[in-house]
């Protein structure tokens, strides 16, 4: 078949999108606005335990949305404890009901799935619950869950297939372990849980499971939160340990065995040290794997049409306009090589791509200074460079790190967690002390970080922060009064909420 410019009227669709997650749906709705004929193919391959879900991708079904709701469940448990100090008479034995939480979370997700279906229908986007595979230039095969196949053609294609959790490849992992894909709809309380991994998924799940009263252990191969600021990562780990989450460091599981079937059952985990011959064993009700995620790019026929991928990671290299090496095929989201794996990034990239393709826009997605939040018990918000990356980029002598602990006023009456919340900015002294890294550990870190992210985009400097009057008494005001540098070695401990 010839190129898209030769036979425009011969295609079934202007754009076929493989993947109905946040990025794919954003691109579909945007393209449809410009009168284009668009199809979305979305298919969820069940997990080894058989878990599947509806339209909307990872974020809505098994990611950000259920994760934040369960984090909120844990925060409410803490709020109940705090409330006694504020005069509320709360029963001593407050219990958490797993089934009720799961039902509420799944009902909300179901309403979102339905909302996406309706939105596509209203915009006249054709949606098929089918697995898409390239079978030749401009052609794709769609296979539904009954095995029925259809062939479609399109002028352009967008790959937005996302990622799925990785397994260990050891005896018993797929038979007996769960992943985050299973956790948010788990029909029984997981009980005593081992979480394997040190990713943000691992630590967030550990945090909210412990927060609702479960016995939680995290098994870590090396460092926490690889790729994030390690100063912040270590503070998160310390706080979690102080709040009863156990860490087994420098061990990896080599075998998982079932001792007793049930919901939950009992499992034996055998693990080996990463730096010696030492072997340890432990018994748990549930083992949750959170060791990373792999791009869903290897079984969609990319080799048939010549799309290059990184053979090691499965990631797709693209131009700054999200174009693959095959001109009529584009890619967005978590499957891109060397790009940030976050829902809002995929949404932005999808919308802007459709605007460039169909509305004459030239605006490209900006992958720099993307804000993010890790919803651990002590939330971590970040924007810009980690301290390690700033040193690597500018040299240690050319950066100044301002930092301070702070104590949220609301925590002073329950008298908890003083000198645990932490604020840090990293400035480039060769560029007017421009803020190149923003980091905050504390309640509502995402809400705090979002506004500062806009300021960083505008070229925020330390002088501008200093001349900004803070709102009192809130956590974010600490950023208007940062005066102690790391280099000075001076104390940053706080005696009260107002420093």
Swiss-Prot record:
Keywords: Cytoplasm, Disulfide bond, FAD, Flavoprotein, NADP, Oxidoreductase, Phosphoprotein, Redox-active center, Selenocysteine, Ubl conjugation. The active site is at 472 (proton acceptor). It comes from the Eukaryota. Its EC number is 1.8.1.9, 1.11.1.2. GO terms for molecular function: FAD binding; glutathione-disulfide reductase (NADPH) activity; identical protein binding; NADPH peroxidase activity; thioredoxin-disulfide reductase (NADPH) activity. ISGylated. NADP(+) binds at residues 166, 198-204, 221-222, 226-228, 292-293, 315, 341. GO terms for cellular component: cytosol; mitochondrion; nucleus. The modification N6-succinyllysine is found at residue 68. The thioredoxin reductase active site is a redox-active disulfide bond. The selenocysteine residue is also essential for catalytic activity. This is Thioredoxin reductase 1, cytoplasmic. The gene is TXNRD1.
């Amino acid at each position: 078949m010839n190129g898209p410019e030769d036979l425009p009227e011969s295609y079934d669709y202007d754009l076929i999108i493989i993947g109905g997650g946040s990025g794919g749906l954003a691109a579909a709705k945007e393209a449809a606005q410009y009168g284009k004929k668009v199809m979305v193919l979305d298919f969820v391959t069940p997990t080894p335990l058989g878990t599947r879900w509806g339209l909307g991708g990872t974020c809505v079904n098994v990611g950000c949305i259920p994760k934040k709701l369960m984090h909120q469940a844990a925060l409410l448990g803490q709020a109940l404890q705090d409330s006694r100090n504020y005069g509320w008479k709360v029963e001593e034995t407050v219990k958490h009901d797993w089934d009720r939480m799961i039902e509420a979370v799944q009902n909300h997700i179901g309403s979102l799935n339905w909302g996406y279906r309706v939105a596509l229908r209203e915009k006249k986007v054709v949606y098929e619950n089918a697995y898409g595979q390239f079978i030749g230039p401009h052609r794709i095969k769609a296979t539904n869950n009954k095995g029925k196949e259809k062939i479609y053609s399109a002028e352009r294609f967008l790959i937005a297939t996302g990622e799925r959790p990785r397994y260990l490849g050891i005896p018993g992992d797929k038979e007996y372990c769960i992943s985050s894909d299973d956790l948010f709809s788990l029909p029984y309380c997981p009980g005593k849980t081992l979480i394997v991994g040190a990713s943000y998924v691992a630590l967030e799940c550990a945090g909210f499971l412990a927060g609702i009263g479960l016995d939680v252990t995290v098994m870590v191969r090396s460092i926490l939160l690889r790729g994030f600021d390690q100063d912040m990562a270590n503070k998160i780990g310390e706080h979690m340990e102080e709040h009863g989450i156990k860490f087994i460091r420098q061990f990896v599981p080599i075998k998982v065995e079932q001792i007793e079937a049930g919901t939950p059952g009992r499992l034996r985990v055998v693990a080996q040290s990463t730096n010696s011959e030492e072997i340890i064993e432990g018994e748990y009700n549930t083992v949750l794997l959170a060791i990373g995620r792999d791009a869903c790019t290897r079984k969609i026929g990319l080799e048939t049409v010549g799309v290059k991928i990184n053979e090691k990671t499965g990631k797709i290299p693209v131009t700054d306009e999200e174009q693959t090496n095959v001109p009529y095929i584009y890619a967005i989201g978590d499957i891109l090589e060397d790009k940030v794996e976050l829902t809002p990034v995929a949404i932005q990239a999808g919308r802007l791509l459709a605007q460039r393709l169909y509305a004459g826009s030239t605006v490209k997605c900006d992958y720099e200074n993307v804000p993010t939040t890790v919803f651990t018990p002590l939330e971590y918000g970040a924007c810009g460079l980690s301290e390690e990356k700033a040193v690597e980029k500018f040299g240690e002598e050319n950066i100044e790190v301002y930092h301070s602990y702070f104590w949220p006023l609301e925590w002073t009456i329950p008298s908890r967690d003083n000198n645990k919340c932490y604020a840090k900015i990293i400035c480039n002294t060769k560029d007017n002390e421009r803020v190149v890294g923003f980091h905050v550990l504390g309640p509502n870190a995402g809400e705090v970080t979002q506004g500062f992210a806009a300021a960083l985009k505008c070229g925020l400097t330390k002088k501008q922060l200093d001349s900004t009057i803070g709102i009192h008494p809130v956590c974010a005001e600490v950023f208007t009064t940062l005066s102690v540098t790391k280099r000075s070695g001076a104390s940053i401990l706080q005696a009260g909420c107002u420093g």
